[in-house]
Design a protein with these regions (language model features):
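Cell-envelope and extracellular/periplasmic
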Residues: 1-424
Length: 424
């Protein structure tokens, strides 16, 4: 990642004498680059070699030869090699993100690849990544595929994406066996897949979408499980730069507000974590928990591409990339009937789908009724029917399905939050 170069390693031995050189050839449509080394001493000769592959949207053919005079004998050949970055997706069914309504196949590319799938973690053969059918080799999910395609097209970097998700599982299911990290469980299967491919040092980011199955537990269970995972990920993937947490959506898990609040606050506790909202994805299927591709997984993938583009590839830090997130809340008139939510992204233009969105807010500690909502740059204002200054906090639960809500100029929904204190 620092040099924009990758490496393809060849290992082998040559038992026969009489050969003068080992030649490594890297070929593209633009030309051939060769390196030669003499074979000195007596056999067996080590044929270990490293081919340097630039990070670009170009497929390379790498061949190894031994020479006898002017005659070459090919001893190894690999086609369609690329060098790029490694991303991991993990969590439950919305991390798996298989097809529920509408195909993502138009986003497939020879420069997005994977090995195995969530249903075939033992696979070790490279394949073009796909997003629709979870049993297909190379399956990475619909929103990860859309995210990857946007990143590839925008930043011209090939990507290897690995999905280790499993539907319907609580956070305990995803934990590492600390005595045997590569045990035959979910964590160990993903780690083994990456370790066998020599990629554990190459993982740049992990994208986590899980929590629906923890809704019946105390949020502390979810938090403790996530903190343990974060520590283990940094141990097993030592060059990990970012962890992206998707805040779960109410619907199949009712509100799960305490878990959603904990997820909102993870970036406040750990500088390597970013959080993404799901509150303004109209493709949400409500009580069914999942998303159509259009206005659902497709949109989530595009939003993540913008976030990773900024964090990993130097794209501009636009104010609309992060989901709106309250920095402070205060009463802003003398009668206690106007409450203003100031956003952390002060430059983002806020939007509201309709006045119906006011019902997604609730005051804590006051019987005042929210009668109106308006928006501005970096702010949302709520109008109350009476003096609400006895309120101590404000909750935003959003809603499931295609219900109008609060979002920024690019449609990124405001994060759900619970009992955020009101400044007096």
């Amino acid at each position: 990642r620092e040099t924009n170069l990758g490496s393809a390693r060849f290992e082998g031995t040559l038992a026969s004498a009489g050969y003068g050189h080992r030649v490594l050839s890297v070929e593209t449509d633009a030309g051939i680059t060769e390196t030669a080394e003499p074979l000195c001493g007596e056999p067996p000769f080590a044929l270990d070699a490293v081919a340097t592959i630039p990070v670009e949207l170009v497929e390379h053919r790498v061949r190894a030869f031994v020479e006898v005079g002017s005659t070459r004998v090919q001893v190894a050949s690999v086609e369609d090699l690329v060098a790029g970055d490694v991303l991991v997706v993990q969590g439950q069914s919305n991390a798996v993100a298989q097809m529920y309504d509408g195909s993502a196949s138009a986003n497939e590319s020879e420069f997005i690849r994977s090995v195995g799938s969530p249903e075939n973690p033992g696979g070790r053969t490279w394949a073009k990544a796909v997003g629709d059918t979870v049993t297909d080799d190379g399956f990475i999910g619909q929103w990860p595929l859309r995210m990857a395609r946007t990143l590839v097209d925008t930043h011209r970097v090939p990507l290897a994406v690995f999905n280790g998700g499993k539907s319907g599982q609580p956070i305990a299911y995803f934990q590492r066996d600390d005595t045997t990290p590569t045990a035959n469980n979910n964590y160990g299967q993903l780690l083994s897949r990456l370790r066998d491919l020599g990629l554990t040092d190459s993982v740049r980011a992990i994208l986590w979408y899980q929590g629906e199955s923890d809704a019946s537990d105390n949020a502390l269970v979810h938090v403790a499980g996530f903190v343990a995972l974060r520590d283990d990920w940094h141990s097993d993937y030592p060059n990990l730069e970012r962890i992206y947490v998707t805040q779960i959506r109410n619907g199949c898990v009712l509100f799960a507000l305490e878990i959603r609040e904990a997820q909102r606050r993870f970036p406040d506790l750990y500088e390597d974590i970013r959080v993404m909202s799901t509150t303004n994805l109209p493709g949400h299927q409500g009580a069914f928990c999942h998303y159509a591709f259009k206005n659902g997984y497709e949109t989530l993938g595009q939003r993540y591409a913008a976030m990773l583009g900024r964090d990993l590839y130097g794209a501009p830090a636009e104010p609309w990339i992060d989901p709106p997130n309250p920095a402070s809340i205060e009463f802003t008139n003398g009668t206690g009937t106007e409450l203003t939510i100031h956003m952390r992204s002060t430059g983002a233009e806020m939007r509201v789908g309709s006045q119906e969105a006011k019902s997604q807010f609730a005051l804590v500690g006051s019987a005042a009724v929210i009668t109106g909502i308006s928006v501005g740059k970096g702010a949302v204002r709520l109008t109350l029917d009476r003096d609400g200054r006895s309120a101590t906090g404000l909750t935003f639960a959003s809603a499931d399905g295609a219900v109008p809500t609060v979002y920024n100029e690019r449609g990124v929904g405001m994060l759900a939050f619970v009992d955020v204190p009101i400044t007096k």
